[in-house]
């Protein structure tokens, strides 16, 4: 469950705390083997072989989500705009007109040390008014998966 989630002016913002240090949460966000274990909302999986992360400014952060029921595929193509390990990752998600996302989405992921763990702040924009709630739900579900991975 998110500590908090808001959507305003077509921005989605989620704050989550984890009982793991920022370095561990960072690794789970940038290591392909770990990303494949938690990326995607419920009902979607991310095959390890689809995860390509070039951890540098201008690098790629690409993967493929596969619907476990229908087999449908949703490619995620992102460019790394900013990286400062283990504190900040900024990505630009390529448009996905088939889902109603006609503009690039910029997602900012901040990792803050907090009470012996990590406070993770994720913000993304611009979302359409229709897609913002779905993005919030999807991010919440995949951060639940991340929490389970970090607790294992």
Regions found by a protein language model. Give the residues of each.
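Beta-strand/loop substructures that line and gate deep hydrophobic ligand-binding cavities in soluble
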Residues: 90-141
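A short, structured loop/turn motif at beta-sheet edges
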Residues: 22-23, 54-56, 81-88, 110-119
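Short coil-to-beta-strand transition motifs
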Residues: 70-77, 101-104
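Hydrophobic ligand-binding cavity/cleft-lining segments
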Residues: 1-46
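Intrinsic-disorder/low-complexity, polar/charged segments enriched in Ser/Thr/Lys/Arg/Asp/Glu/Gln
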Residues: 9-15, 22, 48, 60, ...
């Amino acid at each position: 469950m998110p500590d908090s989630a808001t959507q305003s002016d077509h921005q989605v913002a989620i704050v989550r705390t984890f009982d793991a240090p920022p370095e561990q949460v960072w690794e789970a966000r940038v290591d392909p083997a770990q990303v494949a274990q938690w990326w995607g909302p419920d009902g979607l999986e991310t095959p390890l072989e689809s995860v390509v992360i070039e951890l540098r400014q201008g690098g790629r952060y690409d993967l493929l989500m596969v619907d476990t029921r229908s087999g449908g595929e949703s490619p995620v193509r992102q460019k790394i705009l900013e990286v400062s390990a283990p504190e900040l990752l900024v990505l630009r998600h390529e448009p996905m007109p088939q889902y109603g996302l006609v503009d690039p989405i910029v997602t900012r992921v901040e990792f803050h040390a907090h009470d012996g763990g990590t406070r993770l702040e994720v913000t993304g924009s611009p979302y359409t008014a229709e897609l913002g709630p779905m993005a919030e739900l999807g991010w919440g579900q995949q951060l639940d998966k991340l929490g389970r991975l970090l607790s294992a």
